[in-house]
Amino acid sequence: MDKDRIIALLNRDIEGEHAAIIQYLTHAYAMGEGEMACEIEAIAREEMRHLDWLAETIVELSGVPSLERGKMRMDGGSVADWMRNDVMLEEDGMNSYRQHIKLIDAPKIKRLLERILSDEESHHGDFEHFVEKAQKEGAKDIRGSRQDRITQILNRGIEHEYTVILQYLFHSYMTPKEEVKQEMQDQAINEMQHLGWLAEKIVDISGNPRIEHAEVDQSAKTADMLRADIKIEQEVAAAYDRAAKESTDTDLKQLLLRIRDHEVYHAEVFGDLLTEEEHQG
């Protein structure tokens, strides 16, 4: 099989992992705190690791990792229904990996897909167990229908965090600079924390987190990547600052200011890296 075809198959797998991450996080946040929600978040983190491995493999093949999200299964009126959807999503992934293992003849890539498939088979069993557990424990969707200025602010924050997670990961895959790569990955992890904090806060105040992203910068040059990342961090830090000043909820104000301070730090780190890059260039 030629390299371009392998890249296309791996990108299809990335899109499936991307869908699984967002579907599982949506379900976990909607259930609130609890053992099952924590276990589902842990599965989502394993899917993130799969996405990372696949993206790195694509770059090694001189390809570009896809930022598209595959099809999710988001219907269902109960937590047990959600878990059934998660079972089916894992079945979709397992079938895709098995097919690609047969098609791809590169030993290293085949071995990676077999490794990922092993995880998916385990996840499949976990979600089958969660169907029964959700029914037995009467697990509930604790999201509410609140829609006001506060939930709007929080959902805008989620949109930003999701966007920069994708952007920083993409830049980390595409830059040839190891220091920049490491910083991008570190800041992406921090942004993942922010997304979780914001989603949990919305659920706590009877709202509904909306996990969607805006346009992602896909610059090819490291300096351009850093300029785009500095720009978005400065813009969102200012937005969090305005929102914090507007809020009368002490806990929310503290959360927004904490995230603002992180975003300011990210912009400064990227600024240092840009200075180094421009001097070297």
Protein language model annotation of sequence segments:
Residues 1-281:
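Iron-associated oxidoreductase/ferritin-like identity signal
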